[in-house]
Amino acid sequence: MLAMGTLLYGCQHLEPQLTIGDPSANEPYRSQLRWLEPAPTDTIIQIGELAPQSGGSLWARMRQGFSLQAKTQGVARVDEQRRWLMDRPAFLTQTGRAGSRYLHFIVGELNKRNMPLELALLPAIESGFNPNAQSPAQALGLWQFIPATGRRYQLQQRGDYDERRDIPSSTRAALDYLSYLHDYFDGDWLLALAAYNAGEGRVRDAITRNRARGLATNYWNLSLPGETQNYVPRLLALSQLVNAPADYGVSLAPIADQPYFQMVALAQPVDLAHLALLSGVHERELRMLNPAARGRARGRLLMPLEASRRLLAQPDMIGKAALPHVAGSEEQVVAAPDTGGAEPQVAEVAAPPGV
């Protein structure tokens, strides 16, 4: 079986191999985060027929927002990538375990912008939904921003904090970039996706060459690097599997259409290891939700939904996990809700006086 890294790409770079973080980080949550696995040979079950969960099905919501499916039908390169994915169920399963943490948030952000919900699956292709994934070209995070593109979209990068790993910030930056590319290429999402992988300059030059030769200038007719030739069909193929799993002999483990995490505003930095002991949430889970924190959350904290409710009911828990801190020139610590329009709602928890 191919190493997982061979499936993954980076935003605006052409390095196919990734150095993936410790896969054991997902082990405690394997059963609850599995999403795509081979269907039983004697039956094929679609998500709507599985045990009902409050909030409805996120898969059903995603399908309602799919708008690129017409571009997937009868395309040989998409069919090839679909078979390629189906031959690698371990990738689909491992990717989905992590993706279940983030998909509801990403879908919500896409809905706000009226963007195709197939794009919610892009981190599966970019990073396997691993926020710690890093390429040899230094692309980082769920959305695989290289340093220059991260700076272009105001993602902070310093020694103790790299916002390319931050789930909300990197997601919004990625959608900003995709929206820009969509406009740049006159509303063509396939060209926008190709440019997300290869850079708009490379795609623009390929269009210019074809136009000069009297050739078609759509994505399928452009001469692009091999990685980019596979990148867009692979996303479309994955969306086919999600859109019609029964047609392809896979089953989707249920994901409820409800937030997986809640954002909590912090007045002081919090030690994740200490908070894990106090809250009962596994430290690895806190680190996967707060990968930019590097063990110390500042400003805001992402917590699994049920754990955040317990936290709000016991605000002294934050105080016990708080670290002594003096704001430096690069940050300002406040006890105010995040104003970035985050989904789900941000809750404010201030540390008790004297902590």
How would you describe each model-predicted region?
Residues 179-206, 274:
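Catalytic and binding regions of secreted/periplasmic enzymes and modules that target cell-wall glycans
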Residues 289-324:
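Extracellular LysM carbohydrate-binding repeats and other cell-envelope/extracellular binding modules
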Residues 82-94, 129-136, 144-172, 176-187, ...:
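Substrate-binding clefts and substrate-entry loops adjacent to catalytic sites
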Residues 18-50, 310-355:
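Compositionally biased, proline/threonine/alanine/serine-rich low-complexity intrinsically disordered stretches
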Residues 253-283, 331-338, 344, 349-355:
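Primarily a LysM-type cell-wall glycan-binding module
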Residues 1-9:
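Bacterial N-terminal signal peptides
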Residues 9-114:
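An acidic, Gly/Ser/Thr/Pro-rich helix-cap/linker signature
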Residues 115-131, 192-198, 286-289:
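Short, functionally critical alpha-helical segments immediately adjacent to catalytic or ligand/cofactor-binding
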